[in-house]
Amino acid sequence: DYREIGRWLGEQLRTKKQKIGVIADWKMSEAVQAEICGLNEALEGSESKISWCIYRRKEQDIVERMKKETKADALVVLDAGILEEFGEQAENGTYEGAELYGVGYSLKTIALLDNGNIQGLAVPDGYEIGYKSVEEITKRIEHRSYKMQGYITEYQVLGKENFSMDEDLERFLYSYE
C-alpha cells in the first residue's frame, strides 16, 4: 500500500519543523502519487512542509537539479536507485545534505540504513509484487474477459534507531519467505 508507505515516511518527519524535499520516479505513476498523498496526509497539522518535489526524468542529473531548489532539512526519496546512490555518496563522504528517508528494495539500502547513511527506510516486498503481477497477467491471458485486480502487499519499515543488521537481518529476511 503505497499510501501507507508515504504516511509512514511522513510520520518520521513530522516531529520537528523541517523543510522537506521529495525526489520521486515518474510523475504519472499511481504508486508515486499515492506515496506523496500519504506523505502529505501525515505532515498535515505539523510544522514540517514539503518545499519542493522533483520527478526524475531520463538522463537527468538529480544533484544538479536539486541545486536549483531551496535547501531541505530532509529528503524523501521515492526512487530506490537514487536513494541507494545518495546513501553510497554519504558512505563515501561525498554527500553533504539533508537526512535521507525513502523506499528501497536492496540489501545495499538496508546496509546503508544500518551504517546510519539513511535514517528511515520502507521496504516493499518486491517478490510478492512481482509474483502477484505475473499471476494476474496469466489469468488475463488465459481468460480474455478476466478483469485484472490490484493487491495490497506487505512492507517493512526500518528506522536507524531500531534496526541492527547483526540482530535483525535474519528476522527481516525470514519475514519475506
Question: Where in this protein do the model-derived segments appear?
Answer:
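Hydrophobic alpha-helical segments within soluble ligand-binding/sensing domains
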Residues: 1-21, 105-109, 124-143
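Hydrophobic alpha-helical
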Residues: 39, 55-112
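Short, solvent-exposed amphipathic alpha-helices that sit
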Residues: 5-9, 30-50, 85
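Hinge/cleft segment of the Venus flytrap/periplasmic-binding protein
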Residues: 128-177
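Rossmann-fold dehydrogenase core element
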Residues: 116-123
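Short, well-ordered coil/turn elements that cap or connect secondary structure elements
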Residues: 15, 45-47, 95, 115-116
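Short, high-confidence coil segments that cap the C-terminus of an alpha-helix
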Residues: 17-18, 70-72, 118
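Short beta-strand->loop
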Residues: 21-30
